[in-house]
């Protein structure tokens, strides 16, 4: 439809007419938030962040601090009714050094039961999380660069992999206030509604834990 075609525009749902009308008049966009990064424009579909704010569950999530947890290496993992067993070829279990360090901290300092999850190389396209933490899927992300939408870009396409994330910001040049802003934007975006928990770690300590 073209904005100049009045009859065609009237056939659109009201909410889209309002958006187009606002754009044509130079007004503010009502449903989308345009974000520009490195000369590339994309739409995050951000909702009103004043209405959608994550809960701070840091105290609750870390109440087991000082209690000894456990680290387990799972030798199999089930997805959609199919069990994939570690064979060293198609299914492997090779956690990185940083994944091991974070697991040791979560179990040793915060009493968590941390399970390393095998990686499925074949069949292709099978996404698995890095961990099961107290039975919940978690993926580890180490932030080392900058960008207005750094966190959004890291998690927006991980719906099938995990709804929960750990962000290690030890080597991230962004300020903690900017990281917090980006996390709140992720919770506000209509494209990342699958996000549940986000754990922020720095220098081996949990800084903040968010929940939807």
Regions found by a protein language model. Give the residues of each.
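Glycine-rich, aromatic-bearing surface loops/beta-hairpins
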Residues: 203-212
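Catalytic cores of nucleic-acid endonucleases
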Residues: 142-198
């Amino acid at each position: 439809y073209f904005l100049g075609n009045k009859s065609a525009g009237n056939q659109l749902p009201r909410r889209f007419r309002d958006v187009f009308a606002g754009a044509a008049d130079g007004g503010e966009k009502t449903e989308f938030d345009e974000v520009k990064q490195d000369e590339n424009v994309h739409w995050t579909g951000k909702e009103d962040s004043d209405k959608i704010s994550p809960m701070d569950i840091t105290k609750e999530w870390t109440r087991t601090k000082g209690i000894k947890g456990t680290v387990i290496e799972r030798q199999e993992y089930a997805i959609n009714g199919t069990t994939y067993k570690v064979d060293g070829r198609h299914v492997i279990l090779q956690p990185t050094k940083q994944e091991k360090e974070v697991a040791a901290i979560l179990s040793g300092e915060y009493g968590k039961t941390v399970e390393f999850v095998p990686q499925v190389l074949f069949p292709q396209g099978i996404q698995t999380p890095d961990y099961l933490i107290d039975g919940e899927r978690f993926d580890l992300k180490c932030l080392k660069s900058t960008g207005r939408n750094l966190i959004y870009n890291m998690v927006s396409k991980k719906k099938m992999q995990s709804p929960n994330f750990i962000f290690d910001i030890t080597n991230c040049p962004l300020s903690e206030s900017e990281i917090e802003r980006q996390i709140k934007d992720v919770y506000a975006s209509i494209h990342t509604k699958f996000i549940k928990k986000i754990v922020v770690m720095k220098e081996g300590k949990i800084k903040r834990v968010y929940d939807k």
